[in-house]
Amino acid sequence: MQSLHFEPCELPPEAEALRGEVREFLAETMADYPMAKRAKSWVGIDRDFSEKLGARGWLGMTWPKQYGGHERSMLERYVVLEEVLAAGAPVGGHWVADRQSGPLLLKFGTEKQRQLICARIARGELIFAIGMSEPDSGSDLASIRTRAVKTDG
């Protein structure tokens, strides 16, 4: 039987240093956060919490500064993500904007869209949602029949 083996690795010192900062922030910010809310962190929307993450530079972390990002490493972003999820923090409000819509705007959006929207995402001010279901397909994106058609208008 084949198996995969991964050697343990260490994160760079700047990423591990960030871990302590994130844990301290979460301990303080979430001290009175009820366990029932923590259990629903994926659907929990807490605008104040999202804005606090944005103020610390923990949203849009890897994005260019010209669009409100912070040009941090993917490993630093990983540390923040790991700690926020482990704490049961409310990520539902900013998750799609920070991890899906924002990167898509950076890659495919117009300059005006990047300037107008991305900085607000990085500040935790915008909440996005995505619809990925229709009758007879559920969340199976490959079976969705709805299509977008570009027009001159």
Question: Which residues does each PLM region occupy?
Answer:
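Glycine-rich flavin
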Residues: 31-153
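Solvent-exposed alpha-helix faces
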Residues: 20-23, 85
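Short hydrophobic motif
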Residues: 15, 22, 26-27, 53
